[in-house]
Amino acid sequence: MNLPEASSHSVLANAKSLVPRIIPRAEHGISRKNISNGALRVLYRLYEAGFQAFLVGGAVRDLLLGGRPKDFDVATNATPEQTRALFRNCRLIGRRFRLAHVVFGREIVEVATFRGIGEEGDGDRHVVDGRILRDNVYGGIEEDAIRRDFTINALYYDIADFSVRDYVGGIVDLQQRSLRLIGDPEQRYREDPVRMLRAARLSAKLDFAISEEAEAPIRALAPLLADVAPARLFDESLKLFLSGHGLESLRRLHSLDLLGQICPATARALEGPNRERFGRLLGHSFLSTDERVQNDRPVTPAFLFSALLWEPVRSEAERLLGEGYEHANAWSVAVERILHQQATRIAIPKRFAMAMEEIWLLQPRFELRQRKRVMRLLAHPRFRAAYDFLVLRSHEEPELCEQVQWWTEAQGMSAHDLSESLAVPSPARSEDAPAGKRKRPRRRKRKAGSAAGGAETATQIPGE
C-alpha cells in the first residue's frame, strides 16, 4: 500500500471542526471493480438523489489493505425513511440503531445514517451506566467518524470523486498495523463492551497489534460482557470463530482474559489438569475450521462449540460417575449442566445445541461393538458428525486410534458383511453366553435355512 503520511492522530473535542485528510483516487488502491454491484448501485442512487454517499468501515479498510471484502456498508446523510423511499428492495431494521438493508438477491447492503454526538436524552438516545442502549441521533460525517470504534474503521470512500476521507488518523494506523480506539478507551468499552471482543477479533484477523491505550483497560472491564445479551454474544462468537481466523481469535481472547467471560467453563478447563491435551484438541479443531472457511467449505457452529465445551462435559461426566451415577445418566446430566451454564453467556440456538448434545452422547457408544448397537449407531443421523469428532479426539488421545480405525473400516463394509462379522458366537464357541439371549425363535422362524446350533442370522437393516 503506497499512501502518503498523515500529520496527526489527534481527535478534536469538537467533531464539527475536524478537517479530513483527503486521499485522491490516484494515491490509493481502491478500484470499483472490487466493490460489489449492489453496493455501487446503492451509492450511485443515493448520490444521484442528492444525498452524500460513502462506502465505510471494514470494506474500505480491507480494500486499502489489498483484500476482497464480501460485505459492504454505506453511510449517508439520508434518513432510513429517505433511503427506503429510494429502494423498493429495502427494509428497515433495528431499535438500538436504526438501519436500512437493501437486498439484492443474496447480497445485503447495510445503509446507516450519519450518527450524531448527542447527550443522554437527546432525541432517540438512551444511555444506562455508560452503555448506549439506543442511539438514533443523527448528525454529520465528522460526528459519524468520531462515533466509530477504531480509527481503521473510520475511513470513507466517496462515490462523488472516488477519494478516501480520513478524519481520525486511520491511514497511519493502517500503515503501522495498529488497532487504535477513537476517544477514551475505557469510556468506549463501557458504551459497548462488545468492542473488547472486536479488538481481539480484528487484531487476529488483520494481524495488527492492539495499541497500548486500547489494551490497557480490557482485563479490568472484561466482566462488563456479562451484561451483554447472550443472543448478541452468539452472533459475535460466530464472527470470532467462523471467519477463517478462529484459532488466533481464541488465543487473543484467552490472553486478554475475555474467554472466561463468554465461555467460562472452557477457560477453567484450559487452566485445569488436562489443559495441555484440551488446548491441543482446540488447536486441531479451530485450525481445521479455519482451513474449511478459507477453502469455502461449509462449517457449523455445533462442531466448534462441541470442541470448546468437550473437556467441561467430559470432566463433569467423570465426576458424576465417581459419585455413583449410572454411565448413560452421568453423561446426560453432564451435558445438560454444561449447556445450561453456557446459555447464561452465549445463547446457542436450539438446533445447534441439540446437535452438540448428540455429538457428545454418541462418543461413549463408539466403545460398544455389539451388532445391534453398531447398526443403530451407523444409522444415527448424527453419526458422521460424531465420528468426525472421534477422529478429532484421537489426535490427542492415541488410545482412540483403534476405535477410529475400526469404525472407518465398518463404514466401508456392506451391511451384510458387517452384520456377519458381528454375529453372536455359537454356543460351542461361547459356553458362558446366556442361552436365553442367544436364541431368537421368531427370527429363525422367518428365515429358512438358518445356521444350525442356534447362531443368529444377519439383522435386517432399514433400506438394505
List each language-model region with its residue ranges.
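Catalytic cores of the polymerase beta-like nucleotidyltransferase superfamily
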Residues: 1-464
